[in-house]
């Protein structure tokens, strides 16, 4: 039997691999030389938010950055048009070259699921809450593909944006519960000048909808400033802003603790919103300090002169 030839890797260049086995072989070899492998999973259609994740990953000393580009069919449900999801591979690879990324993993559905989806990761009760209530099976699909990516790449760290906050919490839960030896790093949401969270889906908004979409981040900001008066005041302030834009159909607006459990009486929490504008579903969230008049852990209270708004870059 002929021995398999080593997979080629050119240091300092963008190496594009489709086969999971090739990525596994290359990252194993790189680790043996002392390189730290870090992963940025994406579904392509890269924008500044993705590039921010990549830049955060590149700051890891000695890191070789792996960016996966895979539109995962398992996380699309009924009524969600998988075929319409933007696919811009050539542009994405050009962006990765410009950022100095060394590995792009671009598998097909057949590469990732050669025998179909016989095995999947169940997210537990949180997977049926918030986003999961509107998108049954979504998080099982997300966790399954992330679990596979972590086993294929075996990264020291993997980087995810805080915009998809429930996803971030569930991935951290999975890594802990399944003893996966990867540190999950959350990166703050990247925003447009008016506060709108960057998303590949923003391209579906028309000009009027794009202007209206700024109400989501404005609502979160209003809630953040009201948080010192409690969770109910937080929700009331955010809801008042959203109510001013009738075109926004709110799916949920909730305050939870940082792990998305019940809202705390006082302390660190998360304000989350999901809404539909036209045919586009938008998500956003922000950290809030419930009932905190003097800040938490030495951080200034939101609204104080020393507090920096999250999108004042």
From Swiss-Prot:
GO terms for biological process: pantothenate biosynthetic process. Its main location: cytoplasm. Beta-alanine binds at residue 75. Keywords: ATP-binding, Cytoplasm, Ligase, Nucleotide-binding, Pantothenate biosynthesis. Gene3D superfamilies: HUPs, Pantoate-beta-alanine ligase, C-terminal domain. It is an enzyme of class 6 (ligase). Pathway: Cofactor biosynthesis; (R)-pantothenate biosynthesis; (R)-pantothenate from (R)-pantoate and beta-alanine: step 1/1. The active site is at residue 50. InterPro entries: Pantoate_ligase, Pantoate_ligase_C, Rossmann-like_a/b/a_fold. ATP binds at residues 43-50, 161-164, 190, 198-201. It is found in: Cytoplasm. Catalyzes the condensation of pantoate with beta-alanine in an ATP-dependent reaction via a pantoyl-adenylate intermediate. The reaction proceeds by a bi uni uni bi ping pong mechanism. This is Pantothenate synthetase. It comes from Mycobacterium sp. (strain KMS). The gene is panC.
């Amino acid at each position: 039997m002929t021995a398999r030839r080593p997979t080629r890797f050119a240091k300092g260049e963008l190496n594009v691999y489709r086969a999971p086995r090739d990525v596994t072989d290359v990252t194993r070899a790189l680790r043996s030389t002392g390189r730290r492998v870090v992963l940025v999973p994406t579904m392509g259609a890269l924008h500044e938010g993705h590039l921010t994740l990549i830049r955060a990953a590149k700051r890891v000393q000695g890191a070789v950055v792996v960016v996966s580009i895979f539109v995962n069919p398992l996380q699309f449900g009924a009524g969600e048009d998988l075929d319409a999801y933007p696919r811009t591979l050539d542009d994405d690879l050009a962006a990765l070259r410009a950022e100095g990324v060394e590995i792009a993993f671009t598998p097909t559905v057949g590469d990732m699921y050669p025998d179909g989806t016989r095995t999947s990761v169940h997210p537990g009760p949180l997977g049926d809450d918030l986003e999961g209530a509107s998108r049954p099976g979504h998080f099982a699909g997300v966790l399954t593909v992330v679990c596979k990516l972590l086993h294929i790449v075996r990264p020291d760290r993997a980087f995810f944006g805080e915009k998809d906050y429930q996803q971030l919490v569930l991935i951290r839960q999975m890594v802990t519960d399944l003893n996966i030896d990867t540190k999950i790093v959350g990166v703050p949401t990247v925003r447009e000048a008016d506060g709108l969270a960057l998303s590949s889906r923003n391209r579906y908004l028309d000009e009027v909808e794009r202007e209206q979409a700024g109400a989501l981040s404005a609502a979160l900001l209003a809630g953040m400033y009201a948080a010192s008066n409690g969770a109910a005041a937080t929700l009331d302030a955010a809801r008042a802003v959203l109510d001013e834009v009738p075109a926004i159909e709110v799916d949920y607006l909730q305050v939870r603790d940082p792990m998305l459990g019940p809202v705390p009486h006082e302390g660190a929490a998360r304000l989350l919103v999901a809404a539909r504008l036209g045919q586009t579903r938008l998500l956003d969230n922000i950290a809030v300090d419930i009932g905190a008049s003097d800040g938490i852990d030495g951080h200034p209270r939101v609204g104080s002169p020393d507090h920096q708004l999250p999108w004042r870059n």
